[in-house]
């Protein structure tokens, strides 16, 4: 039995290194060289094909504009303050209860201050009333960076923070700021006049993408009270001269147009579900994405 074990051990050692044939793991040095050379060439070719494929693909992609622009989803609609669970709950007589909401709005509006828009090489005035989309040439580097339209805080009225640093929360009249998310090259198409007839209070403007905030349910509509809108030209929506957006490379300082909404007499001590919705021919809605073209927010003003 000992001899069999010794013989087995000898065979194992001989397989690793055969001194008679000068073989390591059953192969000579020349054999190992050939097989290693084969795999180096083989994987080198695979790497070359992969790199070449990537390079060809990159030649078809523009860093300035999506290749398949028609497949980009419509922009989402979001509100500030940006909150967890889309709930705003506070007591007007308790500053701590609404402090986080106010700070969120203040931080967001920093870039909209006049002091941040003084450079005439970057910013330009695009008018105090809504107008048609402002084309700024092709999506290329030939003209360098493009100018962007200024947006004045004073257009946000009671929700500008210029006269009320609490944005209405101290008075129990909360403000929210609404923006349409950036989509490169997107030009909003306002709805046709006749399509707005079914929405009370909405007025047609060919140069405004309208937005309306209403109670989500029938019981909410009775408790939402008066809703006031503040935007450029006192229009309840987004003026078209701020579109299209040319991207971070061509418009690094771009400012989205804003719409401020103030709820002036919400029913107290009641959670009210509010839906804000943008209307347009190229604005879509999705059950899978609750921010695509609209959003819901719950507001409760406690006594």
UniProtKB/Swiss-Prot annotation:
Residues annotated as carrying Phosphoserine in the record are: 11
Region described as immunoglobulin-like: 191-303
Which Cys residues form disulphide pairs?
126-149, 159-175, 213-276
Compartment(s): Cell membrane; Apical cell membrane; Cell membrane, Sarcolemma
PROSITE patterns cross-referenced by the UniProt entry:
ATPASE_NA_K_BETA_1, ATPASE_NA_K_BETA_2
Q: Where are the transmembrane segments?
A: 35-62
Q: What UniProt keywords apply to this chain's record, in alphabetical order?
A: Cell adhesion, Cell membrane, Disulfide bond, Glutathionylation, Glycoprotein, Immunity, Innate immunity, Ion transport, Membrane, Phosphoprotein, Potassium, Potassium transport, Signal-anchor, Sodium, Sodium transport, Sodium/potassium transport, Transmembrane, Transmembrane helix, Transport
**Which ranges make up the Extracellular topological domains here?**
63-303
The yes or no answer to whether the keyword Transcription is present is no
| Modified positions (Phosphotyrosine) in chain numbering | 101
What is the superkingdom listed in this entry's lineage?
Eukaryota
> Matching PANTHER family, A to Z?
SODIUM/POTASSIUM-DEPENDENT ATPASE BETA SUBUNIT (PTHR11523), SODIUM_POTASSIUM-TRANSPORTING ATPASE SUBUNIT BETA-1 (PTHR11523:SF10)
Q: Which family does it belong to?
A: Belongs to the X(+)/potassium ATPases subunit beta family.
* Name under which the protein is recorded: Sodium/potassium-transporting ATPase subunit beta-1
Say which species the protein is native to: Macaca fascicularis
